[in-house]
Protein backbone atom coordinates (compact mmCIF):
# COMPACT_ATOMS: atom_id res chain seq x y z
CA UNK A 1 0.00 0.00 0.00
CA UNK A 2 2.83 2.37 0.86
CA UNK A 3 4.44 1.67 -2.49
CA UNK A 4 1.19 2.40 -4.36
CA UNK A 5 0.76 5.70 -2.51
CA UNK A 6 4.34 6.69 -3.36
CA UNK A 7 3.80 5.90 -7.03
CA UNK A 8 0.50 7.78 -7.07
CA UNK A 9 2.15 10.78 -5.38
CA UNK A 10 4.99 10.76 -7.93
CA UNK A 11 2.58 10.58 -10.86
CA UNK A 12 0.48 13.40 -9.37
CA UNK A 13 3.54 15.61 -8.85
CA UNK A 14 4.81 14.91 -12.35
CA UNK A 15 1.41 15.79 -13.76
CA UNK A 16 1.31 19.05 -11.78
CA UNK A 17 4.81 20.09 -12.80
CA UNK A 18 4.13 19.19 -16.41
CA UNK A 19 1.24 21.65 -16.42
CA UNK A 20 3.26 24.34 -14.65
CA UNK A 21 6.45 23.91 -16.69
CA UNK A 22 5.39 22.56 -20.06
CA UNK A 23 8.08 21.39 -22.42
CA UNK A 24 8.02 23.53 -25.51
CA UNK A 25 10.06 23.17 -28.62
CA UNK A 26 10.77 26.37 -30.50
CA UNK A 27 8.51 26.90 -33.47
CA UNK A 28 10.35 27.98 -36.57
CA UNK A 29 8.47 29.22 -39.57
CA UNK A 30 10.11 29.64 -42.92
CA UNK A 31 9.07 30.35 -46.44
CA UNK A 32 10.96 29.03 -49.40
CA UNK A 33 11.57 31.72 -52.00
CA UNK A 34 12.07 30.57 -55.57
CA UNK A 35 12.00 31.78 -59.15
CA UNK A 36 8.19 31.39 -59.01
CA UNK A 37 8.11 34.05 -56.27
CA UNK A 38 10.14 36.47 -58.38
CA UNK A 39 13.66 35.63 -57.25
CA UNK A 40 15.79 36.90 -60.16
CA UNK A 41 18.10 33.90 -60.57
CA UNK A 42 20.40 31.45 -58.83
CA UNK A 43 21.54 32.80 -55.45
CA UNK A 44 25.19 33.85 -55.16
CA UNK A 45 25.18 35.55 -51.74
CA UNK A 46 22.80 36.37 -48.88
CA UNK A 47 22.90 39.13 -46.26
CA UNK A 48 20.55 39.84 -43.36
CA UNK A 49 20.86 43.51 -42.44
CA UNK A 50 20.38 45.14 -39.04
CA UNK A 51 16.76 45.99 -39.85
CA UNK A 52 15.95 42.35 -40.56
CA UNK A 53 15.74 42.55 -44.35
CA UNK A 54 17.19 39.59 -46.24
CA UNK A 55 19.24 40.69 -49.26
CA UNK A 56 19.73 38.09 -51.97
CA UNK A 57 22.41 38.59 -54.62
CA UNK A 58 22.02 36.65 -57.85
CA UNK A 59 23.44 36.53 -61.37
CA UNK A 60 20.42 38.46 -62.60
CA UNK A 61 20.04 41.19 -60.00
CA UNK A 62 19.47 41.91 -56.33
CA UNK A 63 16.39 41.16 -54.24
CA UNK A 64 15.30 42.35 -50.79
CA UNK A 65 12.89 40.23 -48.77
CA UNK A 66 11.02 41.75 -45.81
CA UNK A 67 9.29 38.54 -44.68
CA UNK A 68 6.25 39.12 -46.89
CA UNK A 69 7.34 40.68 -50.15
CA UNK A 70 10.29 40.34 -52.51
CA UNK A 71 11.54 43.61 -54.03
CA UNK A 72 13.88 43.37 -57.03
CA UNK A 73 16.68 45.75 -57.99
CA UNK A 74 18.20 45.45 -61.45
CA UNK A 75 20.61 47.50 -63.51
CA UNK A 76 18.89 50.17 -65.59
CA UNK A 77 21.16 51.82 -68.16
CA UNK A 78 19.17 55.08 -68.04
CA UNK A 79 19.18 55.29 -64.22
CA UNK A 80 22.48 56.34 -62.56
CA UNK A 81 21.07 55.27 -59.16
CA UNK A 82 20.43 51.65 -60.07
CA UNK A 83 22.92 48.89 -59.30
CA UNK A 84 25.88 49.02 -61.73
CA UNK A 85 25.37 45.45 -62.99
CA UNK A 86 23.06 42.51 -62.33
CA UNK A 87 25.78 39.97 -61.49
CA UNK A 88 26.19 40.32 -57.70
CA UNK A 89 29.43 38.92 -56.27
CA UNK A 90 29.27 39.87 -52.62
CA UNK A 91 27.38 42.03 -50.11
CA UNK A 92 28.38 43.28 -46.69
CA UNK A 93 26.94 45.63 -44.06
CA UNK A 94 29.39 47.85 -42.21
CA UNK A 95 29.26 49.22 -38.65
CA UNK A 96 27.37 52.30 -39.87
CA UNK A 97 24.75 50.06 -41.48
CA UNK A 98 25.84 50.87 -45.02
CA UNK A 99 25.20 47.97 -47.36
CA UNK A 100 27.93 47.53 -49.97
CA UNK A 101 27.21 45.54 -53.11
CA UNK A 102 30.05 44.25 -55.30
CA UNK A 103 28.97 43.66 -58.89
CA UNK A 104 30.60 42.75 -62.18
CA UNK A 105 30.74 46.43 -63.22
CA UNK A 106 31.27 48.30 -59.95
CA UNK A 107 30.70 48.78 -56.23
CA UNK A 108 27.44 50.30 -55.03
CA UNK A 109 26.27 51.54 -51.64
CA UNK A 110 22.60 51.25 -50.80
CA UNK A 111 20.95 54.56 -49.86
CA UNK A 112 18.18 53.66 -47.37
CA UNK A 113 16.45 57.05 -47.40
CA UNK A 114 15.97 57.13 -51.18
CA UNK A 115 15.87 53.34 -51.75
CA UNK A 116 18.51 53.52 -54.47
CA UNK A 117 22.26 53.14 -54.93
CA UNK A 118 25.33 55.34 -55.24
CA UNK A 119 28.08 53.91 -57.41
CA UNK A 120 31.68 54.38 -56.33
CA UNK A 121 33.97 55.97 -58.89
CA UNK A 122 37.68 56.70 -59.00
CA UNK A 123 39.35 60.06 -59.60
CA UNK A 124 38.78 59.76 -63.37
CA UNK A 125 35.07 59.00 -62.95
CA UNK A 126 35.26 55.29 -63.80
CA UNK A 127 33.40 52.75 -61.69
CA UNK A 128 35.55 51.02 -59.09
CA UNK A 129 35.34 47.28 -59.63
CA UNK A 130 36.28 45.31 -56.52
CA UNK A 131 36.66 41.58 -56.04
CA UNK A 132 36.75 41.59 -52.24
CA UNK A 133 35.78 43.71 -49.26
CA UNK A 134 36.99 43.87 -45.67
CA UNK A 135 35.58 45.85 -42.74
CA UNK A 136 38.01 47.78 -40.53
CA UNK A 137 37.48 50.05 -37.51
CA UNK A 138 37.96 53.21 -39.56
CA UNK A 139 36.23 52.18 -42.76
CA UNK A 140 36.01 49.61 -45.51
CA UNK A 141 38.81 48.17 -47.66
CA UNK A 142 38.06 47.11 -51.24
CA UNK A 143 40.43 44.84 -53.14
CA UNK A 144 40.53 45.33 -56.89
CA UNK A 145 42.77 44.38 -59.80
CA UNK A 146 46.26 45.61 -58.86
CA UNK A 147 44.80 48.06 -56.30
CA UNK A 148 43.33 48.54 -52.83
CA UNK A 149 40.78 51.28 -52.11
CA UNK A 150 39.60 52.60 -48.73
CA UNK A 151 36.31 54.17 -47.70
CA UNK A 152 36.76 56.32 -44.57
CA UNK A 153 33.94 56.69 -42.05
CA UNK A 154 35.54 59.83 -40.62
CA UNK A 155 35.35 62.00 -43.73
CA UNK A 156 33.14 59.76 -45.91
CA UNK A 157 35.80 59.77 -48.60
CA UNK A 158 36.84 57.02 -50.95
CA UNK A 159 40.51 56.91 -51.91
CA UNK A 160 43.07 54.79 -53.65
CA UNK A 161 45.54 53.25 -51.17
CA UNK A 162 48.05 50.93 -52.71
CA UNK A 163 49.04 49.64 -56.15
CA UNK A 164 50.35 46.11 -56.61
CA UNK A 165 53.09 46.02 -59.23
CA UNK A 166 54.21 42.50 -58.39
CA UNK A 167 52.41 40.61 -61.16
CA UNK A 168 50.18 41.72 -64.00
CA UNK A 169 46.46 41.39 -63.35
CA UNK A 170 46.95 40.56 -59.66
CA UNK A 171 43.66 40.67 -57.72
CA UNK A 172 43.48 41.49 -54.03
CA UNK A 173 40.83 38.89 -53.27
CA UNK A 174 41.87 37.95 -49.74
CA UNK A 175 41.81 41.15 -47.71
Model feature map: region roles:
Residues 1-175:
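Carboxylate-rich, polar loop motifs that coordinate divalent cations or form catalytic acidic clusters
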Amino acid sequence: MKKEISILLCVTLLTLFTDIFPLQAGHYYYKQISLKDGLPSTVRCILTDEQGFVWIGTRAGLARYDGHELKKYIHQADNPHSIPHNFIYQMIEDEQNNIWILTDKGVARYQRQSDNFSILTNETGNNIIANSVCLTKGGVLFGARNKVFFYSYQDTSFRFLQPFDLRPNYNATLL
